[in-house]
Amino acid sequence: MEKSGETNGYLDGTQAEPAAGPRTPETAMGKSQRCASFFRRHALVLLTVSGVLVGAGMGAALRGLQLTRTQITYLAFPGEMLLRMLRMIILPLVVCSLVSGAASLDASSLGRLGGIAVAYFGLTTLSASALAVALAFIIKPGAGAQTLQSSSLGLENSGPPPVSKETVDSFLDLLRNLFPSNLVVAAFTTSATDYTVVTHNTSSGNVTKEKIPVVTDVEGMNILGLVLFALVLGVALKKLGPEGEDLIRFFNSFNEATMVLVSWIMWYVPIGIMFLIGSKIVEMKDIVMLVTSLGKYIFASMLGHVIHGGIVLPLVYFAFTRKNPFTFLLGLLTPFATAFATCSSSATLPSMMKCIEENNGVDKRISRFILPIGATVNMDGAAIFQCVAAVFIAQLNNVDLNAGQIFTILVTATASSVGAAGVPAGGVLTIAIILEAIGLPTHDLSLILAVDWIVDRTTTVVNVEGDALGAGILNHLNQKVVKKGEQELQEVKVEAIPNSKSEEETSPLVTHQNPAGPVAIAPELESKESVL
């Protein structure tokens, strides 16, 4: 009771003096100080949530002004600056955090944590895919939507649907990106397969066309290759021992400096989010028609996100930690708002690292090891909307999916989410792989693009939530291992003390030189002499 009074100064004063009239101003002052302290601690969260609400209201108010495309571009400029700052910091943040994280863990811990992370990512993504397929068959989003036309949904500015790609070429691209031929080029380009059609004239007069795959470099950071290189480099520096300590300290310092830059950028997030959301609402032509036409598809996707993010993932976290998952998630409101506004897991990575370490107390070695990997390979939200989209397009074309095709959707969606681009609309590109795998046309992807700006927001939130809860689980398991090791070490020390004394007391030399007399001091003196 005395200690609790000492930690709160205003409580000590209140207990020492009777609750009379003169103490009332100090009590009011104490409340105002507590309120001010609360707002200071949660200022960034409150400002970020306010930015989302103000941005939505601003967009709704400006829709009636019929802004031109140029004016909308100017309106979105502050949000564009936020995206540029976040993307600027991704490369040093990912590389330095993974190198320092991998170098700070020993080989056994790295293998154990890596194995748990891979199992967690794989199982949660597979469960998300199964949930999405079940919801799609129950809700039937494609039933009665065969007459939809993408031109009537305001899709003129969304661009053409992605080119269909063979499944084997998609996985070959994944392997190519894992091992980039040039690390500098990997910082701003990624490998992708394109196709050229070659016409052959046979001797019989027939004309045949052959589609030849051609590997090209497209714009976009090869985050998968950089992640693998950083992990291997961190392990190699750890193996070097003293020779690698200088370089490890360099990456640690670089990482800390990067986190300082992140803390500065975070104060611009509320402004950028406000203009990002406002400009996107102004840009859409007819939101009511869009939602009513594809409402069942949007509902099925978002319901899957709510169930997986609000029930499945928290239950997994509770099963491992026996802690309240929503208390853990409450400290991550700023990253969730950033994910909702930017639609990018990679752009959310800086704020996620900062908040999960400062607000939730996750070990830096854990967060900086697992979060960059999760932002690259863990896409639970993307797997949900990809499976719903695949079943939606099948129902749109009156195709009854058999058990083999459903299994193909589950496996392909889970595998395709690994290495999917952590950028806005990145998941749409992988839907073409699923459709090709089950033999469905890809021309209906334009309908998915029409509402992707809505679904992609909850998709990104679920993606980063899965990464955060995975980091929390790994942190809890690592703490258990550390505590168990400390307990075993204490037991060894406790057992060692009486054993050493008993050996000294029963030493033949001590017994011989001190046949009689007090035995409390003599053993210690003899032992000191023998050591000297």
Curated annotation (Swiss-Prot):
Q: Give TM regions.
A: 42-62, 88-108, 119-139, 217-237, 257-277, 298-318, 328-348, 373-393, 418-438
> What organism, scientifically named, is this protein from?
Mus musculus
User: What reactions does this protein catalyze?
Assistant: L-threonine(in) + Na(+)(in) = L-threonine(out) + Na(+)(out); L-serine(in) + Na(+)(in) = L-serine(out) + Na(+)(out); L-cysteine(in) + Na(+)(in) = L-cysteine(out) + Na(+)(out); L-alanine(in) + Na(+)(in) = L-alanine(out) + Na(+)(out)
GO biological process: one example: cognition
Keywords per UniProt: Acetylation, Glycoprotein, Membrane, Phosphoprotein, Symport, Transmembrane, Transmembrane helix, Transport
Q: What is this protein called?
A: Neutral amino acid transporter A
Post-translational modification N-acetylmethionine, affected residues:
M1
Q: Which Gene3D superfamilies does the UniProt entry name for this protein? A: Sodium:dicarboxylate symporter (1.10.3860.10)
Q: What gene codes for this chain?
A: Slc1a4
Region Disordered: list its residue ranges. 1-29, 495-532
Single GO cellular component term: centrosome
Q: Does the keyword Membrane apply?
A: yes
Q: Which residues are glycosylated?
A: N201, N206
| Ranges in the topological domain labelled Extracellular | 140-216
What this chain does, per the entry, is described as: Sodium-dependent neutral amino-acid transporter that mediates transport of alanine, serine, cysteine, proline, hydroxyproline and threonine.
UniProt family annotation? Belongs to the dicarboxylate/amino acid:cation symporter (DAACS) (TC 2.A.23) family. SLC1A4 subfamily.
> In the record, what terms sit under GO molecular function?
chloride channel activity; L-alanine transmembrane transporter activity; L-aspartate transmembrane transporter activity; L-cystine transmembrane transporter activity; L-hydroxyproline transmembrane transporter activity; L-proline transmembrane transporter activity; L-serine transmembrane transporter activity; L-threonine transmembrane transporter activity
Question: Residues bearing Phosphoserine?
Answer: S507, S527, S530
State its location(s): Membrane; Melanosome
Which loops or segments lie on the Cytoplasmic side of the membrane, by the record? Answer: 1-41
Q: What's the superkingdom here?
A: Eukaryota
Membrane-topology annotation of the record: Multi-pass membrane protein
